[in-house]
């Protein structure tokens, strides 16, 4: 009797120890995600959700990671609202079963959560937020990154190189209108520096607006008074459409050269025929010809979701905007999973070291190379300037020679 009790007690202690170490709970590899799944800017968050779910399905179809299936254990909606993002991130960080995190769909909510995510230490994938301070708190890309943060965004210092070069070589009196977020404010500094580095003049006028602004009369009127010969704009698609309509209403007939937000469905839907002539910067992954990894992703996305809003209007060809609304999330998830596979561990330090060892990874948006100092993936050689043109009665985007 005593022997039985002793054996039983030993078993119970062993089970308790196993449970406390997570051995019983770790039947799946769990990730957490907060993004703008609904709300006025859900083209980013919902697009990323679709991409991450596709990546999870593909890995699980091959047996998961080292024999364990992947699970999106927490998928939370922040509507691109910083306060909601903070609440969501706290919930995710409180769940100690979460192995890796995929962050919000914009600089505002991301900056609201990034310090707590860094302090937590688990691998954090930044799919979209463009301000470099998300990854490099000293704001100098390639130096002293946050230890656990990896970026798949088109950083606005990278975007500014292509945008500034085009503006400097084509216009003399440039006006800049930007959103008032960290993305917009830092973007102006990078853009102005890029214009001047390429031999152009400092912008003659600068103004800002709040995300969701319904009227930009004051901003456009200021540009008109400054006699600009082009407007450079940094913002999201819905807001850039308001800007373009305001330019038309006030008869300011100058080119609009915009950040990547102008190349997506929200801008096209909001600006209509006024999109013609608009120029914008974008990762060129979905231009022709596509690399094999990009073409394979496009085929898999179309098979799962069809030619939906994120695919775009052309049933045969995905829109360029997928690179910053969908496939960035796909690449972020795949690099996280590849890091876990290489590490053969779910310990944060092991996964981070494994991701830093990744070289020559064929992603959708880029070929990724990470290191201890390099935690971002997109470089200037992958960014191009595109223009809305009309061919055969249809409005389409085409790359321009620089």
Q: What is each residue range found by the language model?
A:
Residues 11-14, 24:
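Cleavable N-terminal signal peptides
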Residues 247-330, 384, 388-389, 395-400:
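Extracellular/periplasmic periplasmic-binding protein-like sensory domains
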Residues 306, 310-398, 402:
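Segments of small-molecule ligand-sensing domains
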Residues 1-11:
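Bacterial N-terminal signal peptides that target proteins for export
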Residues 87, 132, 139-251, 269, ...:
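Extracellular/periplasmic Venus flytrap/periplasmic-binding protein
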Residues 32-53, 75-83, 105-106, 177-185, ...:
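Extracytoplasmic "Venus flytrap"
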Residues 43-50, 62-139, 152, 209-216, ...:
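Beta-alpha junction/loop-to-helix N-cap segments that form part of ligand/metal-binding clefts
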Residues 19-26:
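Sec/Tat signal peptide C-region and signal peptidase I cleavage site
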């Amino acid at each position: 009797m005593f022997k039985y009790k002793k054996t039983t007690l030993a078993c119970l202690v062993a089970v308790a120890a196993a449970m406390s170490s997570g051995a019983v709970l770790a039947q799946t590899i769990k990730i957490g995600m907060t993004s703008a799944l609904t709300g006025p800017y859900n083209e980013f968050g919902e697009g990323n959700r679709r991409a991450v779910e596709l990546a999870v399905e593909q890995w699980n179809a091959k047996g998961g990671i080292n024999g364990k299936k992947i699970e999106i254990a927490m998928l939370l909606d922040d509507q691109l609202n910083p306060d909601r993002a903070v609440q969501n991130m706290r919930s995710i960080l409180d769940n100690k079963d979460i192995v890796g995190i995929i962050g919000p769909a914009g600089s505002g909510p991301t900056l609201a959560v990034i310090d707590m995510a860094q302090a937590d230490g688990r691998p954090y994938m930044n799919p979209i937020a463009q301000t470099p301070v998300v990854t490099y708190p000293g704001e100098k890309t390639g130096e002293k990154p946050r230890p656990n943060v990896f970026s798949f965004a088109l950083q606005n210092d990278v975007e500014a190189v292509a945008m500034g070069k085009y503006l400097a070589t084509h216009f003399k009196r440039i006006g800049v209108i930007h959103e008032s977020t960290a993305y917009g404010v830092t973007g102006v500094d990078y853009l102005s520096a890029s214009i001047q580095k390429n031999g152009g003049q400092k912008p003659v006028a600068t103004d800002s607006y709040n995300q969701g602004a319904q009227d930009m009369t004051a901003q456009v009127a200021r540009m008109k008074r400054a006699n600009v010969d082009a407007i450079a704009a940094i913002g999201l698609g819905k807001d850039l459409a308001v800007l373009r309509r305001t330019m038309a209403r006030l008869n300011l007939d100058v080119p609009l050269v915009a950040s990547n937000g102008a190349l997506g469905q929200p801008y096209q839907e909001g600006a209509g025929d006024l999109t013609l002539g608009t120029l914008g910067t974008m990762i060129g992954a979905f231009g022709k010809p596509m690399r094999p990894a990009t073409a394979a992703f496009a085929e898999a996305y179309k098979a799962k979701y069809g030619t939906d809003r994120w695919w775009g209007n052309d049933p045969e060809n995905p829109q360029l905007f997928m690179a910053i609304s969908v496939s960035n999330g796909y690449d972020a998830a795949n690099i996280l999973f590849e890091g876990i596979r290489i590490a053969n561990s779910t310990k944060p330090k092991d996964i981070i070291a494994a991701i830093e060892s990744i070289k020559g990874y064929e992603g959708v948006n880029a070929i990724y190379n990470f290191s201890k100092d390099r935690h971002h993936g997109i470089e200037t050689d992958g960014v191009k300037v595109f223009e809305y043109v009309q061919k055969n009665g249809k409005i389409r985007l085409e790359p321009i020679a620089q």
